[in-house]
């Protein structure tokens, strides 16, 4: 990933793992019918919410289901938090499988358009499903997939490597210190489960550091919360010149906006911060 331009993860290999681990996904897709057609190709049961009225009163699905949530980034704050509570409750219910796929607009930036509560309900963001990108997965193969994922070994040194990455992201100079850079207490488990998914896709029985890097590029850009105001840059506490810091932060923000527009990757600033951390953190040998 570091040697090529960043891109959003594909939905094809992502959705089966999301169902296996009971995770929710964000999809950069303005037309939710594209997601619906993808689910139909997989013969998966789904529901499409037409509106977000009375979220509290909506019945909780008892059977397996993929819930398609269109234009979630346009919801009001109160609606977002109600939706977050709904999704949190659904994760704890005893259904064969449940996952939500929230569609958002191309300019969506998670920490700017999602409340922290809602953002924590999603695993990561993926690209619009491609025509013909459906896998051979179906709901009958889900138990076998879960069993295969559990068999992928994660060595304690890999776990330590992930923790080192999380720690460096939390204290990065461009990370929002008030929120720990957006790295929540779920980050370790989320990353390790994604590592198991990628290892299984490569037909590996264990996770290696390169897989951790790939998983980090898939996961962290969606969750990272970066400073917007140069006065929040942490080096100011140690005597950095405020004017120089402001010039640096503004230049980085402008550059990331330009690159995001050029390569159609909306999380470029987050990608730069993550790339910096991955270049600094050395995995255990």
Curated annotation (Swiss-Prot):
Gene3D superfamilies: Magnesium chelatase subunit I, C-Terminal domain. It comes from the Eukaryota. May be involved in telomere capping. Belongs to the MTC2 family. This is Maintenance of telomere capping protein 2. The lineage of its organism: Eukaryota, Fungi, Dikarya, Ascomycota, Saccharomycotina.
């Amino acid at each position: 990933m570091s040697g090529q331009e960043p891109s959003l993860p594909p939905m094809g290999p992502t959705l089966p793992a999301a169902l296996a681990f009971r995770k929710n996904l964000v999809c950069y897709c303005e037309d939710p019918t594209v997601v619906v057609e993808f689910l139909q190709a997989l013969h998966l049961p789904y529901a499409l919410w037409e509106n977000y009225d009375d979220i509290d009163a909506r019945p909780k699905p008892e059977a397996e289901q993929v819930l398609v949530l269109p234009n979630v980034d346009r919801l009001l704050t109160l609606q977002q938090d109600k939706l977050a509570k709904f999704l949190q409750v659904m994760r704890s219910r005893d259904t064969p499988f449940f996952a939500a796929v929230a569609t958002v607009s191309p300019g969506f930036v998670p920490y700017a358009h999602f409340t922290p509560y809602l953002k924590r309900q999603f695993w990561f963001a993926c690209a619009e499903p491609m025509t013909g990108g459906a896998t051979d997965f179906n709901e009958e193969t889900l138990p076998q997939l879960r069993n295969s994922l559990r068999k992928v070994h994660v060595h304690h040194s890999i776990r330590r490597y992930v923790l080192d990455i999380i720690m460096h992201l939390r204290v990065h100079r461009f990370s929002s210190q008030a929120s720990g850079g957006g790295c929540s207490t779920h980050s370790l488990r989320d990353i390790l489960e994604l590592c198991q998914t990628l290892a299984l896709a490569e037909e590996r029985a264990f996770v290696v550091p390169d897989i951790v890097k790939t998983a980090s590029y898939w996961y962290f850009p969606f969750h990272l919360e970066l400073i917007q105001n140069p006065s929040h840059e942490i080096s100011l506490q140690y005597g950095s010149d405020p004017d120089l810091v402001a010039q640096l932060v503004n230049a980085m923000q402008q550059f990331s906006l330009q690159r995001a527009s050029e390569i159609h990757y909306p999380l470029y600033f987050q990608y730069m911060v993550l790339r910096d951390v991955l270049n600094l953190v050395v995995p255990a040998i």
